[in-house]
């Protein structure tokens, strides 16, 4: 029993396409063309000296730092269902639940968000059934010297207010 083989001939790719150099030079030529055009006439370039000047064209749907909302009594709306932590693709939300005395509901005893891991996708906000977590603080920058300063705990999250954009 002989094995039958079939020889397949591939189309030859032209030399210039194989080395990609023409495409690299074309891209660089376009970049330099824009660079020198803007260098010659910089009147149409808008500059924003942040943080002295704040952007004015931010929409209300822009996601800032997180906050935990409260109900009419002043208690946190969060029932520690862990749905926000489950929905988070970066696994940056950590919740420890505790039971409320005289009630079947739970409340978070610890609620921590690692802002260095967070990708600010907003899936935690969409997953929350009680509308307990929001990203509408209007705070878009966070500055710190240590990794611990980027851990937002339950106290920090509950003190943040809804911001003005």
UniProtKB/Swiss-Prot annotation:
Record carries keyword NAD: yes
Top class in the EC scheme: translocase
Membrane topology: Peripheral membrane protein
Domain 4Fe-4S ferredoxin-type: from-to ranges: 66-98, 109-138
Cofactor note: Binds 2 [4Fe-4S] clusters per subunit.
Segments passing through the bilayer: none
Chain sites annotated for binding [4Fe-4S] cluster 2: 88, 118, 121, 124
PROSITE patterns per UniProt: 4FE4S_FER_1, 4FE4S_FER_2
Subcellular location: Cell inner membrane
Chemical reaction(s) catalysed: a quinone + NADH + 5 H(+)(in) = a quinol + NAD(+) + 4 H(+)(out)
Cofactor list: [4Fe-4S] cluster
GO molecular function, one term: NADH:ubiquinone reductase (non-electrogenic) activity
Keywords: 4Fe-4S, Cell inner membrane, Cell membrane, Iron, Iron-sulfur, Membrane, Metal-binding, NAD, Quinone, Repeat, Translocase, Ubiquinone
Enzyme Commission number(s) from the entry: 7.1.1.-
Superkingdom field: Bacteria
One GO CC term on file: plasma membrane
Binding sites annotated in the UniProt record for [4Fe-4S] cluster 1: 78, 81, 84, 128
Job of this protein: NDH-1 shuttles electrons from NADH, via FMN and iron-sulfur (Fe-S) centers, to quinones in the respiratory chain. The immediate electron acceptor for the enzyme in this species is believed to be ubiquinone. Couples the redox reaction to proton translocation (for every two electrons transferred, four hydrogen ions are translocated across the cytoplasmic membrane), and thus conserves the redox energy in a proton gradient.
Family: Belongs to the complex I 23 kDa subunit family.
Subunit structure: NDH-1 is composed of 14 different subunits. Subunits NuoA, H, J, K, L, M, N constitute the membrane sector of the complex.
Official protein name in the record: NADH-quinone oxidoreductase subunit I
Organism for this UniProt entry: Campylobacter fetus subsp. fetus (strain 82-40)
Biological classification of the source: Bacteria, Pseudomonadati, Campylobacterota, Epsilonproteobacteria, Campylobacterales
Gene from which this protein is expressed: nuoI
